[in-house]
From Swiss-Prot:
Highest taxon of the lineage: Bacteria
Protein name: Serine hydroxymethyltransferase
Co-factor requirement: pyridoxal 5'-phosphate
Pfam family, one: SHMT
PROSITE patterns in the cross-refs: SHMT
Main location: cytoplasm
Catalytic activity, reaction form: (6R)-5,10-methylene-5,6,7,8-tetrahydrofolate + glycine + H2O = (6S)-5,6,7,8-tetrahydrofolate + L-serine
Organism: Desulfitobacterium hafniense (strain Y51)
EC class (word): transferase
Length: 417
């Protein structure tokens, strides 16, 4: 990248070299981590703009610093665009991350010790949905729901039983490793019956929701949180959507509650990404993500891998690698050695520890951003199968050649030199 050579290399060759190496990794490896994606040049440019210099504590029109007239425009653009994208009454675009967004909702609506119902991390939930090592699990009394052992899908009758038994102040839906559609309408019915607030963390599926490929939680949830990267293909950051009646409480929870100054350069990048997501081609992109995931999942199943829940409805799949005599940790390492990046992942009712696991998580947003199609997915599945079925140098060489050919055929940022 020219900016590395021109601006960073003369000033800091060590950082420049690390960035250059990461660029090479992204270009010449196949990125299958479900939570990662490749942003547009426009998003990158906005994030690297002069807005990084501006402090802007507060909200548009109500800042604690002068000179905010132009960053106010940017933040208002981001808020209005994302409200239009999801049909929301209120949006806060200041959270630095999805974790910050979730924490802000808890901070706004709960008191320490309040009971919350959230999805078990080992069944596909998220760290911030009550894990005992996270602030959510330390400060609040989380009760976990999971998936049925036979179907590996959420059993809404069990969720209802738990909700009526524990009467939580808040029910949290959403996941980091759940390959099926979530019925937000049903969960809102359960929340109403139990007298609970309802929050949806749609971080992984926000792009699919924006494109109309997954039920939109906004009409059903009191609060919707998300990251702005992943399927939404924006910068790394967070977002909260809510009904107008909760707007003041949410805004106060973010600032001055848990954050100081917003990252205005990131908010600018969010605004650009939301603008991109409002275009018709974004819908087609999301359709390709889902189609690619379906074909990749089916092809891996044909090659003898067990796919958790039998398939996928969204952008990701969980692959049980025990049929290859491997752990998730081993599979992650073997695939990385041939240029395929995945992450080890616990599968429901996993007998292995979270640091070892029996599965890997695979997602298609990043490869779809490179332009890869269903034929490419079949080639990726073949490369994965060869690498994991033939864990020797001969198998690795075959898989590496397949990866190199795909990366050459579908270049990343081809004009960014």
């Amino acid at each position: 990248m020219d900016y590395i050579k021109e601006w960073i290399l003369p000033q800091d060759p060590e950082v420049a070299e690390a960035i250059a190496q990461e660029e090479q990794r992204q270009r010449y490896k196949i990125e299958l981590i479900a939570s990662e994606n490749f942003v547009s040049r426009a998003v990158m440019a906005a994030q690297g703009s002069v807005l990084t210099n501006k402090y802007a504590e507060g909200y548009p029109g109500k800042r604690y610093y002068g000179g905010c007239e132009y960053v106010d425009i940017v933040e208002d653009l981001a808020r209005e665009r994302v409200k239009k994208l999801f049909g929301a009454e209120h949006a806060n675009v200041q959270p630095h991350s999805g974790a910050q967004a979730n924490t802000a909702v808890y901070f706004a609506m709960l008191k320490p010790g309040d009971t919350v119902l959230g999805m078990n991390l080992s069944h596909g939930g998220h760290l911030t949905h009550g894990s005992p090592v996270n602030i959510s699990g330390m400060y609040y009394n989380f009760v976990a729901y999971g998936v049925d052992q036979a179907t590996e899908r959420i059993d809404y009758d069990v969720v209802r039983q738990l909700a009526l038994e524990h009467r939580p102040k808040l029910i949290v839906a959403g996941a980091s490793a759940y390959p099926r559609q979530i019925d937000f309408a049903r969960l809102r019915e359960i929340a109403d019956e139990a007298g609970s607030y309802f929050m949806v963390d749609m971080a992984h599926i926000a792009g699919l929701v924006a494109a109309g490929l997954h039920q939109n939680p906004v009409p059903y949830a009191h609060f919707v949180t998300t990251t702005t990267h992943k399927t939404l293909r924006g910068p790394r950051g967070g977002l909260i959507l809510c009904q107008e009646e909760f707007a003041k409480a949410i805004d106060k929870a973010i600032f001055p509650g848990i954050q100081g100054g917003p990252l205005m350069h990131v908010i600018a990048a969010k605004a650009v990404a939301f603008g991109e997501a409002l275009k018709p081609e974004f819908v087609e992109y999301q359709k390709r993500i889902v189609e690619n995931a379906k074909v990749l999942s089916e092809t891996l199943a044909e090659k003898g891998f067990r796919i958790v829940s039998g398939g996928t409805d969204n952008h990701l799949m969980l692959v049980d690698v025990r049929s290859k005599g491997l752990t998730g940790k081993e599979a992650e390492y073997i695939l990385d050695e041939v240029g395929i990046t995945v992450n080890k992942n616990t599968i429901p009712y996993d007998p292995a520890s979270p640091m070892v696991t029996s599965g890997i998580r695979i997602g298609t947003p990043a490869v779809t951003s490179r332009g890869m199609d269903t034929l490419a997915m079949k080639k990726i599945a073949a490369a994965i199968d060869i690498a994991l079925s033939e864990p020797n140098e001969a198998g690795a060489a075959k898989a590496r050649d397949m990866v190199a050919a795909l990366c050459a055929e579908y270049p990343l940022y081809p004009n960014l030199d």
